[in-house]
């Protein structure tokens, strides 16, 4: 595993008393009046804290879903802990950071033949499938494959982004696929599922685990000795969601004990993406243009008061693609608190491109702002930078990485000596102290001793 180099990624180590918000304010004050490009401040310490929180709440090895945010410094941080991928490019990224192939799962059930061959030539053996055609394709393109995982469909009707409409085998089809794999002498080592991104009902996991147990039993009947269960993602990554992470894990843990108890010999993994990165990234955008829409104008209903349209230097073709593809609802914040008696106006916020679709916020209340002023958007780490384009010639925002000194020291300890059996409370604030001992769990997460990646 390559070590994280703070100089390579220009990671600023925060002295005691300083926060990521201080760096963000500093960057805003540093830029000249003519150079106010949008930028991110990413707190890598927040990512590490999320990992510690995971280890306390859920006895499952996390494979970070690289597709969620593939910024190199972030992936390098998680590669020192744990990671997951879905394409040749993501495999190249994580292996370039020193992640060994045995800790990579190619978790895309629909793969291009050339990319299957690339995985084979680079030692990646663990991958998913959900159809006979995919099974045959993998058998031909990767003859030495020994570790296939059967993706099953789940009820993801309560998810923000549904996946089972595209991926997953039914229970009936699962038996047929297992029988076909046995005929081809291909080893199926386990089962995977995904309840959908942005899951809003933790009970969905219970039914999915019950279905997975059923498929495991089918595998035993067919002649397989399956030992891997992948429970996918769907975990919240910020505190502004209705369903909290611990509310989900409080439902998952009893279900795991029921269907896959610690003495079952089944290794349980997951593919969290949003959970790790959403809250770590804050985006700063600058107002580049402003339009006043007066009462009775052609642009506004006659009954309305004066409103403002603000145009900023990032939009839905850039970081805010999450609005279109991830159903995100973003809220602008101001770097400085408005005066108590300041008047608020109905406002809309637009991106910089020539497309009328490039609208970030349809309506919100803001004090009157001016060209050159800044707006902040929190919780912008998930499905933002990874899918941003340069449409119309607008460049992606720069990313400034920060980490507190205690978290930096903990990161180096993890890289040099593995995860410590105990982490001092002052290192992580209010977060958990150890991998599993503090939680009262019998099942210890394998992530305490190793790191992995979901491709």
From Swiss-Prot:
The record marks 194 as: Stacks against the aromatic ring of pyridoxal phosphate and stabilizes reaction intermediates. Substrate binds at residues 325-326, 355. The modification S-nitrosocysteine is found at residue 354. It catalyses: L-ornithine + H(+) = putrescine + CO2. One of its GO terms (cellular component) is cytoplasm. Its cofactor is pyridoxal 5'-phosphate. GO terms for molecular function: ornithine decarboxylase activity; protein homodimerization activity. Pathway: Amine and polyamine biosynthesis; putrescine biosynthesis via L-ornithine pathway; putrescine from L-ornithine: step 1/1. One of its GO terms (biological process) is regulation of protein catabolic process. It is an enzyme of class 4 (lyase). Inhibited by antizymes (AZs) OAZ1, OAZ2 and OAZ3 in response to polyamine levels. AZs inhibit the assembly of the functional homodimer by binding to ODC monomers. Additionally, OAZ1 targets ODC monomers for ubiquitin-independent proteolytic destruction by the 26S proteasome. The keyword Phosphoprotein applies. The active site is at residue 354. The modification Phosphoserine is found at residue 297. Belongs to the Orn/Lys/Arg decarboxylase class-II family. This is Ornithine decarboxylase.
């Amino acid at each position: 595993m390559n070590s994280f180099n703070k100089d390579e990624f220009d990671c600023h180590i925060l002295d005691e008393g300083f926060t990521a918000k201080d760096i963000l304010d500093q960057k805003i004050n540093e830029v000249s009046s003519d150079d106010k490009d949008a930028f991110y401040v990413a707190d890598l310490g927040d990512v590490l804290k999320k990992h510690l929180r995971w280890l306390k709440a859920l006895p499952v090895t996390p494979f970070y879903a690289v597709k969620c945010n593939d910024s190199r410094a972030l992936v390098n941080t998680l590669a020192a802990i744990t990671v997951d991928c879905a394409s040749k490019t993501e495999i190249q990224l994580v292996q370039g950071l020193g992640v060994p192939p045995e800790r990579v799962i190619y978790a895309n059930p629909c793969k291009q033949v050339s990319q299957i061959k690339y995985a084979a030539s680079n030692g990646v053996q663990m991958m998913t499938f959900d159809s006979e055609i995919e099974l045959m394709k993998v058998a031909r393109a990767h003859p030495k494959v020994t570790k296939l995982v059967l993706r099953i469909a789940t009820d993801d009707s309560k998810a923000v982004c549904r996946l089972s409409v595209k991926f997953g085998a039914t229970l009936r089809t699962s038996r047929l696929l297992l029988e076909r794999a046995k005929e081809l002498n291909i080893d199926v080592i386990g089962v995977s599922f995904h309840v959908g991104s942005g899951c809003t009902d933790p009970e969905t996991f219970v039914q999915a685990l019950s279905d997975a147990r059923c498929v495991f039993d089918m595998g035993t009947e067919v002649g397989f000795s399956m030992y891997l269960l992948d429970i996918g993602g769907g975990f919240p990554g910020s505190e502004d969601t209705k369903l909290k992470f611990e509310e989900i894990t409080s439902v998952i843990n009893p279900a795991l004990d029921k269907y896959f108890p610690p003495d079952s010999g089944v290794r349980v993994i997951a593919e969290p993406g949003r959970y790790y990165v959403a809250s770590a990234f804050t985006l700063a955008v600058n107002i580049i243009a402003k339009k006043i829409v007066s009462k009775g104008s052609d642009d506004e209903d006659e009954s309305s008061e004066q409103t403002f349209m603000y145009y900023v230097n990032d939009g839905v073709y850039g970081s805010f693609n999450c609005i279109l593809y991830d159903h995100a609802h973003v809220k602008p914040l101001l770097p400085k608190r408005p005066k108590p008696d300041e008047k608020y106006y109905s406002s809309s916020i637009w991106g910089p491109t020539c497309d009328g679709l490039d609208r970030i916020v349809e309506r919100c209340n803001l004090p009157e702002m001016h060209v050159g002023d800044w707006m902040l958007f929190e919780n912008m780490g998930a499905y933002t930078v990874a899918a941003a384009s340069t449409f119309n010639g607008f460049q992606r925002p720069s990313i400034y990485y920060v980490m507190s000194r205690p978290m930096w020291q903990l990161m180096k300890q993890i890289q040099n000596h593995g995860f410590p059996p105990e982490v001092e409370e002052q290192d992580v604030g209010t977060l958990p102290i150890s991998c599993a001992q503090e939680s009262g769990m019998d099942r210890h997460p394998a992530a305490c001793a190793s790191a992995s990646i979901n491709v």
